Regions:
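Interdomain "pre-motor" coupling segment immediately N-terminal to P-loop NTPase/helicase cores
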Residues: 4-60
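Short loop/turn elements that form and flank the Walker-type P-loop nucleotide-binding site
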Residues: 93-95, 122-123, 146-149, 181-184
Length: 195
């Protein structure tokens, strides 16, 4: 006896096969944070990117600024404070998240880049995040949890409107809620004084 598959049976079999493939992909995404980790050896600095297709990744920065702390002039007090805080963080001692404020061109971003260059040989890494992506901060922190490196999550030009979701995500991390930053993560932000 010869069995024949109708066109409907063939289409149904193909549909089931595709549904199984989709479920497998979705299952893999659910297992992790949904953020593709980078080749950690590729750089000391990374950019968090959320792509239009919903995929997210940490993208290595090819050309990291070579700013050094000694290059920064006339900001000795700020330089000493951020260097001490970063040194404590690197030593596993208590350290604070940082909000730098001030006029444009006063060295705020340069301080953070110089700290990265000072401590990258000891395992410090920087992850730059756009303000609009701060809503993904808990997933980002989960991605680096358990890594031997120490991470500064950095956001430039931080300002929020009332009730903005990114503000709520950042505030929950800073306030130490259930999704608190791990021992290997500090947040260094640049923004307005009232944030």
């Amino acid at each position: 006896m010869v069995a024949f598959m109708s066109q409907t049976d063939t289409l149904l079999t193909e549909l089931i096969k595709r549904a199984d493939q989709l479920l497998e992909v979705l299952g893999k995404q659910q297992q992790g944070t949904g953020i593709e980790p980078p080749d950690w050896a590729a750089s000391v600095a990374f950019r968090y990117r959320r792509f239009r297709n919903g995929r997210a990744a940490l993208v290595p920065v090819s050309h990291v600024a070579t700013m050094r702390l000694d290059d920064l002039k006339e900001i000795d007090d700020q330089k000493e404070k951020i260097q001490r805080n970063t040194a404590h963080f690197m030593a596993g001692l208590p350290a604070n998240n940082v909000l730098l404020t001030g006029a444009r061109g006063t060295g705020k971003s340069s301080l953070i880049k110089a700290c990265l260059n000072t401590y990258s040989g000891d395992g410090l890494r920087l992850i730059e995040v756009d303000k609009s992506d701060l809503i993904d901060l808990p997933d980002l922190i989960d991605t680096v949890a358990g890594r031997p490196e120490r991470f500064i999550v950095y956001c430039d030009d931080l300002s929020f409107d009332d009730g903005e979701p990114a503000y709520k995500a950042l505030k929950s991390i800073l306030d130490g809620t259930v999704s608190a930053a791990g021992a290997n993560v500090l947040i260094y932000e640049i923004g307005r004084a009232h944030v």
